UniProtKB/Swiss-Prot annotation:
Disulfide pattern: none
Cellular location(s): Secreted
Keywords assigned by UniProt, alphabetized: Bradykinin receptor impairing toxin, G-protein coupled receptor impairing toxin, Hypotensive agent, Secreted, Toxin, Vasoactive, Vasodilator
Domain of life: Eukaryota
Origin species: Vespa xanthoptera
GO molecular function terms attached to this record: toxin activity
GO biological process terms on file: regulation of blood pressure; vasodilation
Expression across tissues: Expressed by the venom gland.
Keyword Cell division: no
Similarity-based family: Belongs to the bradykinin-related peptide family.
Entry protein name: Vespakinin-X
Length: 12
């Protein structure tokens, strides 16, 4: 349920 490249610790 998260877009590719999504990280809860790094949002770019």
């Amino acid at each position: 349920a998260r877009p590719p490249g999504f990280s809860p610790f790094r949002i770019v």
